[in-house]
Amino acid sequence: MNHSIIASRCLVFVLMLLATGAVMAGDPMKGRPLYEIRCAGCHGPEGVPQVAGISNFKMGEGLMKPDQQLLSFVKKGKGVMPGFKGILTDAEIMDIIAHIRTFF
């Protein structure tokens, strides 16, 4: 095989990974302190909400969506939940999502 074919196949592989969001996986250890600061006030330190009408992560509420959909939701906010676009980076939000997934 010549080098241009190998390089082309490698490029296609990397682009496929980027397109699927595989590179965006969050780190739950990095997400924990961010969750404690930004989310625990309403969702509780272990994912059990302190306020009525808020997702209970311990019960899996709100977690059955793909990471990209949750990322969009956290950035925009809805109802009493504020949006975090411009406050948290996409990587930080993905870290928080990874941490939240450890509750269920």
Positions of the model-derived regions?
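Bacterial N-terminal signal peptides that target proteins for export
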Residues: 1-11
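Sec-dependent N-terminal signal peptides
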Residues: 10-18
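N-terminal signal peptide c-region/cleavage motif recognized by signal peptidases
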Residues: 19-21, 26
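Short pre-active-site segment immediately N-terminal to redox-active cysteine/selenocysteine motifs
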Residues: 27, 35-41, 46, 77-80, ...
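Gly/Gly-Pro-rich "capping" loops immediately C-terminal to redox-active cysteine motifs
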Residues: 28, 32, 44-73
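Conserved beta-strand positions that form and line the central face of beta-propeller blades
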Residues: 56, 80-83
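Periplasmic c-type cytochrome electron-transfer domains
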Residues: 68-81, 100
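C-terminal capping alpha-helices of c-type cytochrome domains
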Residues: 74, 86-104
